[in-house]
Amino acid sequence: MNNGVRKKVTLAGLLVSIGIVYGDIGTSPLYVMKAIVNENGGIASVNREYIVGSISLILWTITLLTTVKYVLIALKATNHGEGGIFSLYALVRKKAKWLVLPALIGGAALLADGTLTPAVTVTTAIEGLKNMRFGNDIPVPNQNSVLIITIIILLFLFSIQRMGTSIIGKTFGPIMLIWFTFLGLTGAMNLSHDLSLLEALNPVLAVKILFSPANKVGVLILGAVFLATTGAEALYSDVGHVGKGNIMASWPYVFICLALNYLGQGVWILENPNYHAGNTDFNPFFEALPSQWKFFAIILATLAAIIASQALITGSFTLVSEASGLKFLPRMKIIYPSTEQGQIFIPSINKMLCAATIGIVFLFKTSEHMEAAYGLAITVTMLMTTILLFEYLSLKKVNILLRLVFLFLFGAIESMFLISSLAKFLHGGYVTVIIAAFIGAIMYIWYFGNKVRDRREAKNAYVRLDEYTSMLSNLSHDDSVPLYATNLVYMAKVKYNKFIKRDILYSILDKRPKRAHAYWFVTVNVTNEPFTAEYAINTYGTKNVINVQLYLGFKQQQKVNVYLRQIVHELIKDGTIESQPQEYTTTPGRDVGDFKFVIVNDVISPQTQLNTYEKWLVESRVWLQNLSSNPAVWFGLEYADTVVERVPLILGSQNIKSIQRTKLK
């Protein structure tokens, strides 16, 4: 990422940030007050003390969690411009090994909760159309119609992700600016009827309502209040797409508009205590609007809901990309729609998110049921982020007293939200817990499986390539061995320009000697620039053993066979390697022979000596690798002559009992 560009605050940058970052938190007014009223038994069961106290809780929750923790503190904890819990972990992981656990737990929970955000926001917006009359027609007469429209919108949203966040942000930015202005305007109109509700700005009222008889659910009200700030973690994850400067500059306007709308809804509820009493479809957000504005509000809310979903999707792409880099997840195919490295698209994750979100819509069917499940997992993520931020502040030499205040203040607040949200478990929260556990299990297996493998791998797993060049050259010129290929290419990482896995040489020399005119060992290095296409070589003083280091930009297609053919032509032309004239060819004067690419996969050897737990970890990790990735596609070799070989992976000390010779019996 070009950090210099990203730090600049521009009008265009502000617009894009509003379009990408604030969708989730910006659509909370659609359902937060509805959830708070329903928690207490409906509009007929609430009074002024309850409404004022609840709004005070909302405003101070947003102030403390979103403004102070995320905008003022967390946005400073970026890693090369990228944010999110994994980026934060990358900054502090050297401080203590155990910090990997909050990173794994928090990341898995955030990805799981992201499946609910698109479902609940879009469904809530479309429910505003239910039973609305247009002339003599009612286009959306029931909940089934709502579900159909919701699913169509979600399918459209996931289908446009390939365009990239820059294009989407430029489209969504103006819409979200209109949305927040609309929230502020309508809220101010209702608030003007009773300015005394501004007493909700007093934090004492927020504390009092937790223990007031007017609040029938006690501290469990925090489960509904927390919905107002679920988008804070997504805000942090999306900083790589728009830059922290643009977020910090645009947040005050967004916060003011949100506050005005919550206050305005509160005034309307108090003015209409018997309105729609007992109606389960009641939503104060839409009811508080003038009737002639409702259709426009529903259309605008639907667009805002789509953008809310976008914030979670782009954040999920960033999280998964970072998780792969930290070896929490297998490597996945990443597409860069723009020249900014922070803007990515991961097709496999997009498909899984789409399937999970639509599945949740079918499972819960109504926004009320979704709200009951929403927010549980994200409280876990926020708590884990607090732990990692505490370590980050320590890394930055912040005064120990201030660090402890931060840890205990936000730890206590988020623990209360977590406890209150646990009440949601049986009402649907179990769904996100199951999804989070599944994602967390994959991360755990991949990370700790790699750790076991690296720790228990034989000390001689890597050998010096330059010590085998003589043997390879002799094999190349040994006419008694049949020719396997003119150019034999191994996709194998050569470390420090000389160390290579013994498996590679085992494949060439031990299984059945593979004779070739030239042996190529290719390492692909992805650079931070978008369109780099460079290479460097080391022949170790030979004409037929070549270590090729490819340096490809993150947007550059990894068509290794195309690049290698060009490299061979250049090396033959300058005499670095020998010419490869072809006697039989359709191309006169052709001086480059055939290519055979070899990809080596590991399989656990029966000789591996590990305890049951470690063996399960490594076997599961190898299984995940074979399931999740296709190296031939990754390196652009799907149409090349490619061989995938399996070689035994022997881990741990080998205690093989020797066999004794005896006489025939």
UniProtKB/Swiss-Prot annotation:
GO terms (molecular function) for this protein are:
potassium ion transmembrane transporter activity; symporter activity
Origin superkingdom: Bacteria
According to UniProt, the reaction catalysed is: K(+)(in) + H(+)(in) = K(+)(out) + H(+)(out)
| Lipid bilayer topology | Multi-pass membrane protein
Membrane-traversing stretches: 13-33, 55-75, 98-118, 138-158, 167-187, 195-215, 217-237, 250-270, 295-315, 344-364, 375-395, 400-420, 428-448
Can you cite an annotated GO cellular component?
A: plasma membrane
Q: Does the keyword Transmembrane apply?
A: yes
UniProtKB keywords:
Cell membrane, Ion transport, Membrane, Potassium, Potassium transport, Symport, Transmembrane, Transmembrane helix, Transport
Matching entries from InterPro entries are given as: K+_transporter, K_trans_C, K_trans_N, Kup
Entry-linked Pfam families: K_trans, K_trans_C
Is the keyword Oxidoreductase assigned to this protein? no
Q: Where in the cell is it found?
A: Cell membrane
> What protein family is recorded?
Belongs to the HAK/KUP transporter (TC 2.A.72) family.
Q: What does this protein do?
A: Transport of potassium into the cell. Likely operates as a K(+):H(+) symporter.
Q: What is this protein called?
A: Probable potassium transport system protein Kup 2
Instruction: Quote the gene name from the UniProt entry.
Output: kup2
